[in-house]
Amino acid sequence: MANLRKTHPLLKIANDALIDLPAPSNISVWWNFGSLLGLCLAAQILTGLFLAMHYTSDIATAFSSVAHICRDVNYGWLIRDMHANGASFFFICIYLHIGRGLYYGSYLYKETWNVGVILLLLVMMTAFVGYVLPWGQMSFWGATVITNLLSAIPYIGNSLVQWLWGGFSVDNATLTRFFAFHFLLPFIIAAMTMIHLIFLHETGSTNPAGLNSDTDKISFHPYFSYKDLLGFAILLIALIALALFSPNLLGDPDNLTPANPLVTPPHIKPEWYFLFAYAILRSIPNKLGGVLALLFSILILMLVPVLHTSKLRALTFRPLTQFLFWLLIADVAILTWIGGMPVEHPFIIIGQVASFLYFFIFLILLPTAGLAENKMFA
């Protein structure tokens, strides 16, 4: 009689994804971030569920309800700090995961890649609406600034913004619907993650050599199941350490002040993981242009497979493109720094140069380097 896990309709799916899955024997720790993102999502849904049990999405009580969670709910402070910092770890993992995909040519699995970009957009949207919920100063003003960007859309912009707000400013209706979105979106993300995996398991994983690994596969369990557990342990230890020792390190002090529509904070800026996109938005002196650049800074990832010119998949044996890849990483770091700086000289010009370089690397330099390397290898 065959093993139940290989015959049962449901267990068979789990078996083919987590136990008997053939995996390349040489995938490095860079292939751990997919499972780490799954862990992040599970942790965020779990902590978020417990927070939602005590949170009230009303402007009169939202801020106080978060204070109540931290002061009066058993381990509420821990749940809140794990959830807030869990978002940062989520983005660290997602950016490393995307970086791995860019470096090793994983984007050539187009369906998997495009679902991944949609997942990135969904996670960013979830983080944005979630940041509004504590109803602190930066929550309120961040929501005001970012939702206002929709008014740049010709003709329907203003109506669209008021429709999104549910009034003439960010108010109670806005907070209530953002809570609804923030509760709903993670489950949509979980569903999209399943689709992401279905597409991935059609082709299997890439590997650090960028070569076909069909001749050299090992089973996912026990090798990579245990490797993933090691990753889980490291991530959870780091998250718990941050949540226990320095829970406010990555937050904005302005958000410890309740929202006040009459007082604008001196520097409105998002959380660190949005700063690179915020810098690109600010570097264009035209509202609509800035919004389009902001959108395109993420959507450009969908163009990467189309712009792939090299005969080789990974950057492992492509020194020219490797240099450009690390230039891109440095550029994103500079954009992240600029996004948190005030709009004044010399930060304005640095931001504009870095924004130009960001698009120039993706659209011009990487495809050109690929062609040049083809010539070199010919």
Swiss-Prot record:
InterPro entries: Cyt_b/b6_C, Cyt_b/b6_C_sf, Cyt_b/b6_N, Cytb/b6-like_sf, Cytochrome_b, Cytochrome_b_C_euk/bac, Cytochrome_b_N_euk/bac, Di-haem_cyt_TM. One of its GO terms (molecular function) is metal ion binding. Signal peptide: none annotated. Its main location: mitochondrion. The keyword Electron transport applies. It is found in: Mitochondrion inner membrane. GO terms for biological process: mitochondrial electron transport, ubiquinol to cytochrome c. It is a multi-pass membrane protein. One of its GO terms (cellular component) is mitochondrial inner membrane. The chain crosses the membrane at residues 33-53, 77-98, 113-133, 178-198, 226-246, 288-308, 320-340, 347-367. The keyword Ribosomal protein does not apply. Binds 2 heme b groups non-covalently. Its cofactor is heme b. Heme b b562 binds at H83, H182. Keywords: Electron transport, Heme, Iron, Membrane, Metal-binding, Mitochondrion, Mitochondrion inner membrane, Respiratory chain, Transmembrane, Transmembrane helix, Transport, Ubiquinone. A ubiquinone binds at H201. The cytochrome bc1 complex contains 3 respiratory subunits (MT-CYB, CYC1 and UQCRFS1), 2 core proteins (UQCRC1 and UQCRC2) and probably 6 low-molecular weight proteins. Component of the ubiquinol-cytochrome c reductase complex (complex III or cytochrome b-c1 complex) that is part of the mitochondrial respiratory chain. The b-c1 complex mediates electron transfer from ubiquinol to cytochrome c. Contributes to the generation of a proton gradient across the mitochondrial membrane that is then used for ATP synthesis. Belongs to the cytochrome b family. Heme 1 (or BL or b562) is low-potential and absorbs at about 562 nm, and heme 2 (or BH or b566) is high-potential and absorbs at about 566 nm. This is Cytochrome b. The gene is mt-cyb.
